[in-house]
Amino acid sequence: MDKKLENQKDLLNQDPKVELNSQSVAKNPLNSREVKPIQRRRPLRKNARDKNSKPEFEERVIAIHRVVKVVKGGRRFSFSAFAVVGNKKGRVGFGHGKANEVQDAVKKAIKDAQNRLVSVPIYRKSTVPHEIAVKYLASKILIKPAPRGKGIVASNTVRAVVELAGYTDIYTKTYGSRTKINVVRATLKALLKLRTINQVAELRDLSPQQAQAQKV
């Protein structure tokens, strides 16, 4: 009986923690060197936009019109939006969108403008290469080069187009109808007719220096 009591006391006095032998430690996969480290989270996708980064193209809403259509059941209202987009590096576009809501019409106009991008020449990274006058329907526009630092002399409608195209120094003057849509189309028509010195020299079989000395 005394031996049994002594054995029970020894069991009670033992440390409750279980001691691991060398074999159990070796078999434990967590203690082996072959266990791979925990993988980090996947990096962000390349096409994911950074919140702090600026978009390549900027957009401006030129006009929003409400359209009313009379049907048997009454009147149906919709909206028509016009927008200009550009990267300020010689790329600019003008688009039109229709929808039942203003926001949807603006989105469609911006998307349409992005699909209609055109390239325009920028002389010395600030102005147009030469003077030009263009007429579109009842609207007329005159565009002249300006010295560096002069800024943009233009109406709000024309300013939206030339700024997004990338011009920083330019003179403009509009005549006739001041309808915003016609003015924008006249401005784009004028910009598309601009020619660089190299283009003029190639057309006239002259050197760039000779073409620059002559009036374009």
Swiss-Prot record:
Point to the regions of Polar residues compositional bias. Answer: 20-31
Domain S5 DRBM, residue spans: 57-120
Give the keywords, sorted: Ribonucleoprotein, Ribosomal protein, RNA-binding, rRNA-binding
GO process terms (BP): translation
Pfam families, A to Z: Ribosomal_S5, Ribosomal_S5_C
InterPro entries, from UniProt?
A: Ribosomal_Su5_D2-typ_SF, Ribosomal_uS5, Ribosomal_uS5_bac-type, Ribosomal_uS5_C, Ribosomal_uS5_N, Ribosomal_uS5_N_CS, Ribsml_uS5_D2-typ_fold_subgr
Q: Which family does it belong to?
A: Belongs to the universal ribosomal protein uS5 family.
Self-association and partners: Part of the 30S ribosomal subunit. Contacts proteins S4 and S8.
For domains, the record's comment is: The N-terminal domain interacts with the head of the 30S subunit; the C-terminal domain interacts with the body and contacts protein S4. The interaction surface between S4 and S5 is involved in control of translational fidelity.
* Its job: With S4 and S12 plays an important role in translational accuracy. Located at the back of the 30S subunit body where it stabilizes the conformation of the head with respect to the body.
What NCBIfam families has UniProt attached to this entry?
rpsE_bact
Protein name as annotated? Small ribosomal subunit protein uS5
Organism in which the protein naturally occurs: Mesomycoplasma hyopneumoniae (strain 7448)
